[in-house]
Structures are given as C-alpha cells and as structure tokens.
Amino acid sequence: MLSRRIIPCLDVRDGRVVKGVKFRDHIDMGDIVELALRYRAQGADELVFYDIGASPEGRSVDYTWVERVARLIDIPFCVAGGIGDVETARAVLHAGADKISINSPALGRPQLISELADAFGVQCVVVGIDSIREEDGQWRVRRYTGDPSKTQALPMRTLDWVAEAQRLGAGEMVLNCMDNDGVRRGYDIAQLRQVRALCRVPLIASGGAGDMQHFADVFDQADVDGALAASVFHSGAIPIPELKQFLRAQQIEVRDGQ
C-alpha cells in the first residue's frame, strides 16, 4: 500500500468552516482559506471541503471559495456539495478542485457515479457515505445530513451501497461513521473493516478521531488508505507534524510533511 494519507476535513456553511457533533449543533471554526493554508503548511496530504448546506438546500457549491483555495494551496483537495450533474462537476474541477465527492445526489440517482467517471475518470470521483448503526444492528445510509431537519433515513444497507457505488465507478470512498462523528472516541473499526473487505478502491475513514493512537489503530486494524478528521485539527489538539512523527514511530508509512 502507498503511504497513508492524513486529511483535514473542512465543513463549509455560509462561506465559513464549521464543525458539529454527530452532524448537529455546528459552531464556527474559522475562515476557509486561512485554515486551508494552515493545514498545507503543517503537512496535510490533502484537504476535503464539504459544503454541508448545498444538497439539503437544493443548490450547488459556491465556486468562489473553491477558486480562492486553488490559487493559494498546492496540495490536492476534494470538494463536495450539491454536485448533481456533469456540468456542475466540471465547474468545480475548472475552479481548481482536484477531485469531486458526491453523496446525497448519488443516492437519488446512482447513475451519476458512472456519468462522472466516464466524463472525468474514476480518479476524480469520490463517493461519500454517511452511515449509522440502527437498532437491528445493521449499518444503513443517511441522506441530506448537512441539515438535521432534512436528514433522511434510507432502507439501504451501507455495505450494499458500497458494493453498488464501486460497481458504478467510484474511484475512492469516504465512510463517514455518524455514531462516532465529533465525539473523539476513535474510529468505527468494526464497520470500517467490513467495508474494507468489500472495497477494492481507496477507502478513507471519517468520524471519531480523538488522539494520535486512534489514527494508528484505524490504519493498522482497518487497513484504510487515509484518515479524515476535523475537530482535533481545527482545535489544535493534534498538530499534523507530531501526528506523522507518531505514526512513523509505529511503523506506519506516511508522507513527509511540508
């Protein structure tokens, strides 16, 4: 496997970075560009930006901040939010994003995955999956999680959607484990291991990082390609250079920092 990736996640609302707990009660964390520059300087391998209001509000991502970020950073970044057709995806990529991520729009129209893969290549197409464990013990998919008042519980099992999205042409997947989001108790290793067994494309873990050992655990125990986190990076609780040094000491290969 290639070097494991450390990926700060920036949830965007109204032109600012915000962060919630279990996808609720978001608070302001700072300016988009300032945070992007900070993470680039610290040695982040890439960035992910989620315009969390776009899909619930029926709009596309705001291209202006995408262009600002692209002008100022030189590491790859991925953008998600209301990307429901090839034209919108093309505009986001032309604004400077390296990859586009789709979540709710693909659940409404799965063929979108194939359309984007055909238009831009699978390497540009990331499928994000918001997953939660229900009372029957099954993990199932949620849609429109950027707005708690509009979030929809779907009958589709997470594992079934992983298999379908991969078949349709997803080049990478991000599994957002909603039960663990923002609580800093560690990644959902059990769920990630089941997804890893099905997923032949790069898999990124999201939700639950609270200390450096959590990153080591998810790489060692779930064999993911990258680990995404937000609150521990935004707050400064885990500086990226120290995290990479820690992982190297655990014999986990990571890229050199900037």
From Swiss-Prot:
<keyword id="KW-0028">Amino-acid biosynthesis</keyword>
<dbReference type="GO" id="GO:0005737">
    <property type="term" value="C:cytoplasm"/>
</dbReference>
<protein>
    <recommendedName>
        <fullName>Imidazole glycerol phosphate synthase subunit HisF</fullName>
        <ecNumber>4.3.2.10</ecNumber>
    </recommendedName>
</protein>
<comment type="subunit">
    <text>Heterodimer of HisH and HisF.</text>
</comment>
<dbReference type="GO" id="GO:0016829">
    <property type="term" value="F:lyase activity"/>
</dbReference>
<dbReference type="GO" id="GO:0000105">
    <property type="term" value="P:L-histidine biosynthetic process"/>
</dbReference>
<dbReference type="InterPro" id="IPR050064">
    <property type="entry name" value="IGPS_HisA/HisF"/>
</dbReference>
<comment type="function">
    <text>IGPS catalyzes the conversion of PRFAR and glutamine to IGP, AICAR and glutamate. The HisF subunit catalyzes the cyclization activity that produces IGP and AICAR from PRFAR using the ammonia provided by the HisH subunit.</text>
</comment>
<keyword id="KW-0456">Lyase</keyword>
<comment type="similarity">
    <text>Belongs to the HisA/HisF family.</text>
</comment>
<keyword id="KW-0368">Histidine biosynthesis</keyword>
<comment type="pathway">
    <text>Amino-acid biosynthesis; L-histidine biosynthesis; L-histidine from 5-phospho-alpha-D-ribose 1-diphosphate: step 5/9.</text>
</comment>
<dbReference type="GO" id="GO:0000107">
    <property type="term" value="F:imidazoleglycerol-phosphate synthase activity"/>
</dbReference>
<dbReference type="InterPro" id="IPR013785">
    <property type="entry name" value="Aldolase_TIM"/>
</dbReference>
<keyword id="KW-0963">Cytoplasm</keyword>
<dbReference type="InterPro" id="IPR011060">
    <property type="entry name" value="RibuloseP-bd_barrel"/>
</dbReference>
<feature type="active site">
    <location>
        <position position="11"/>
    </location>
</feature>
<dbReference type="Pfam" id="PF00977">
    <property type="entry name" value="His_biosynth"/>
</dbReference>
<dbReference type="InterPro" id="IPR006062">
    <property type="entry name" value="His_biosynth"/>
</dbReference>
<feature type="active site">
    <location>
        <position position="130"/>
    </location>
</feature>
<dbReference type="InterPro" id="IPR004651">
    <property type="entry name" value="HisF"/>
</dbReference>
